[in-house]
């Protein structure tokens, strides 16, 4: 078969490890008890109570008014200037993939270590990508990517630092991409109210609302950039059920405030449990905690043998990331291994 029309190479793409891969763990630890307790992601274990969805949402194409309602709800929840600044998408990951393809090839600095899909997406789109350890190391990059709060260590930058960086990049025709996937429940100041030609913000829905399978995420950008991104995604990018559920959830500020309080208490409880096990918490958010252990690989295997999945890091074998258990049974299972 002649593959000359294809732009991709024949080599297999390199796989990026993610949390939530229970299939691989079941194969590696076939004697582990079921059901597995999945603490390998940073997804809220107590999901938003899904409201009833009209049957027609499953059977007809989404309407423009429904998309606009979601945009307005998202703008209010995130503090964006208007619904015209909001780009709904079937998950933030597709936005991470789409944005690099809209820009001419340039130098990209990714503040790392962080979520690996950012560097991978910019590289696939033909940009020259470097992972840098600090804002001082970005040099003359045309695009800078920061995850704030960062995954996996929870690192944050002040709003002044982030706004200053966006302004600097804008003056030279560049762009700051601020991934605020874990910002909803944290006491951080979002950049969403300040988007302009040099700033695009990404927001995740599934992590905060515990509905990752719904596939919903947002870009917040000035209206011209937002329109280009929406055009790149194509029509009906978000399903009817996701539009309905997302609009209801984003409009529920009381649930969001109570969830922030409850998950912060859970994170503090997890920190105490990790400390009793000899771990040193190095950071995180209220949806996950990252810690170093004297024998990280050994603890990882011990947890897996007990049917508990946590996130490990090839480059830092002493480091593990823990999500939050969903209920009393989950907390007890984790406690038995860590004590």
Question: What is each stretch, according to the model?
Answer:
Residues 123, 130-185:
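Active-site phosphate-binding strand-loop segment of PLP-dependent enzymes
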Residues 100-123, 128-130, 134-135:
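Conserved PLP-anchoring active-site segment centered on the Schiff-base-forming lysine
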Residues 2-66, 73:
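N-terminal "arm"/small-domain region of PLP-dependent enzymes with the aminotransferase-like
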Residues 158-160, 305, 315-339:
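PLP-dependent enzyme catalytic core of the Aspartate aminotransferase-like
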Residues 198-281:
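PLP-dependent aminotransferase class I/II
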Residues 264, 274-306, 324:
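Conserved PLP-binding catalytic core of the aspartate aminotransferase-like
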């Amino acid at each position: 078969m002649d593959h000359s029309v294809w732009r991709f190479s024949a080599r297999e793409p390199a796989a990026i490890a993610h949390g939530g891969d229970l299939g691989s763990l079941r194969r590696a630890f076939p004697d582990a008890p079921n059901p597995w307790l999945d603490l390998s992601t940073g997804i809220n274990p107590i999901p938003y109570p899904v409201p009833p969805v009209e049957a027609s949402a499953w059977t007809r194409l989404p309407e423009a008014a429904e998309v606009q309602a979601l945009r307005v709800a998202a703008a209010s929840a995130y503090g964006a200037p208007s619904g015209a600044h909001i780009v709904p998408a079937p998950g933030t990951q597709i936005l991470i993939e789409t944005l690099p393809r809209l820009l001419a090839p340039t130098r990209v600095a990714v503040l790392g270590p962080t979520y690996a899909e950012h560097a991978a997406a910019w590289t696939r789109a033909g940009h020259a990508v470097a992972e840098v350890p600090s804002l001082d190391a970005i040099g003359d990059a045309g695009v800078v990517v920061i995850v704030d709060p960062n995954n996996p260590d929870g690192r944050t930058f002040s709003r002044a630092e982030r706004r200053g960086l966006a302004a600097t990049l804008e003056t030279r025709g560049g762009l700051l991409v601020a991934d605020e996937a874990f910002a909803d429940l944290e006491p951080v100041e979002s950049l969403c109210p300040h988007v302009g030609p040099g700033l695009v913000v990404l927001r995740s829905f599934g992590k905060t609302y515990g509905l990752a399978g719904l596939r919903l995420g947002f870009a917040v950008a000035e209206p011209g950039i937002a329109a280009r991104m929406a055009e790149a995604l194509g029509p009906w990018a978000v399903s009817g059920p996701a539009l309905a559920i997302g609009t209801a959830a984003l409009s529920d500020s009381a649930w969001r405030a109570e969830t922030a309080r409850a998950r912060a208490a859970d994170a503090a409880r997890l920190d105490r449990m990790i400390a009793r096990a000899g771990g040193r918490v190095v950071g995180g958010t209220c949806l996950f905690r990252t810690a170093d252990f004297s024998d990280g690989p050994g603890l990882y295997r011990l947890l897996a043998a007990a049917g508990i999945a946590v996130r490990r890091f090839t480059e830092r074998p002493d480091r593990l990331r823990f999500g939050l258990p969903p209920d009393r049974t989950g907390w007890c299972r984790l406690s038995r291994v860590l004590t």
